[in-house]
UniProtKB/Swiss-Prot annotation:
Coiled-coil segments on the chain, per record: none
The keyword Cytoplasm is annotated on this UniProt entry: yes
Protein name listed in UniProt: Thymidylate synthase
Organism expressing this protein natively: Parabacteroides distasonis (strain ATCC 8503 / DSM 20701 / CIP 104284 / JCM 5825 / NCTC 11152)
Molecular function in Gene Ontology: thymidylate synthase activity
EC number: 2.1.1.45
Chain positions recorded as dUMP binding sites: 21, 126-127, 166-169, 177, 207-209
Length: 264
């Protein structure tokens, strides 16, 4: 995944110093894009080991429309604990917006179901978009969405996905986001009878936190290895029927994990 290392290097060489909400401080650039062809392999970072279990369970949690950390904690995933209320609630974050976007009539819109149906029945549509950035609901979210919205594109029997991420923690968050949306693309492709095409990752404020600089420099000394493959249970036909056991990663040979503290 040289695209990712090129992003790290760009921010180190061109980035400007900025203060941030957490008080940690960052260096950042504005506007960057990476493209991953899923036919070439599953884009799971190899220059440090990632916790795939957390990525899969978080995505299933989003797709279930859940916004309480209990489901994640029950499966040993703690990545959302810092933002949860005492009862485990995170407010109207991703899963709520994806599956239950409030409409003006007092009902709700299931954006994922609508995306699936549009891909199947109107694949040339330029409106196959799922948004988590609900301006009217931001105050009801414990953490406003960093990966704000994504769009599907169908051509030549291939389904592609482009994500716009307004705020991108490059060292900790972005590797998770790449893998999560690449996996979502594979799942949606299977659920709609298409091949998985390109995942296009567009970043707004792409930043490295000041307490991750040494880790980033270490990572840049490592040579990327061959990408793994993600095998998905072919019997699953609905985007909502996937379980953790339906995913099998093969050929993953990463460099050792590099620890970094989360800026809350």
């Amino acid at each position: 995944m040289k695209q990712y290392l090129e992003l790290l290097n760009r921010v180190l060489t061109e980035g400007v110093r900025k203060e941030d909400r957490t008080g940690t401080g960052t260096i950042s650039v504005f506007g960057h894009q990476m493209r991953f062809n899923l036919e070439e392999g599953f884009p799971l970072l190899t220059t440090k080991k990632l916790h795939l279990k957390s990525i899969i369970y978080e995505l299933l949690w989003f797709l279930n429309g859940d916004t309480n950390v209990k489901y994640l904690q029950d499966h040993g995933v703690r990545i959302w604990n810092e933002w949860a209320d005492a009862d485990g609630s995170l407010g109207h974050i991703y899963g709520y917006q994806w599956r239950s976007w409030p409409d003006y009539k007092g009902g709700s819109i299931d954006q994922i179901t609508e995306a699936v149906e549009t891909i199947k029945h109107n694949p040339d549509s330029r409106r196959i978009i799922v948004s988590a950035w609900n301006v009217a609901d931001l105050d009801n979210m414990n953490l406003p969405p960093c990966h704000a919205f994504f769009q599907f594109y169908v051509a030549n029997g291939r389904l592609s996905l482009q994500l716009y991420q307004r705020s991108a923690d490059i060292f900790l968050g972005v590797p998770f986001n790449i893998a999560s949306y690449a996996l979502l693309l594979q799942m949606m492709a299977q659920a709609t009878g298409l091949k998985a095409g390109d995942f296009v990752h567009t970043l707004g404020d792409a930043h490295i936190y000041s307490n991750h600089l040494e880790q980033v420099k270490l990572q840049l000394t490592r040579e990327p290895r061959a990408l793994p493959r993600m095998e998905i249970n072919p019997d699953v036909k609905s985007i909502f029927d996937f379980k953790f056991e339906d995913f099998n990663l093969t050929g993953y040979d990463p460099h050792p994990h590099i620890k970094g503290e989360v800026a809350v």
